[in-house]
């Protein structure tokens, strides 16, 4: 059973990474599953240069909003979001 959960978490992590890369094509993205729909994400992109942390986070959250919306949303929370320019 734990393997199924891990596989599902890995699939969602891949969806998160894909959604972020679609919105921020040059991004280096790392996603870590924390369990029960919780994730930690790190994103490095030139797009973030000269943007405030709030603006950087807004770009990422906009990209993953579909994964956080609805009763059966696979992403419950972003426990940690790190964004920075290279």
What is each of the regions a protein language model found here?
Residues 13-20:
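Short amphipathic alpha-helix segments
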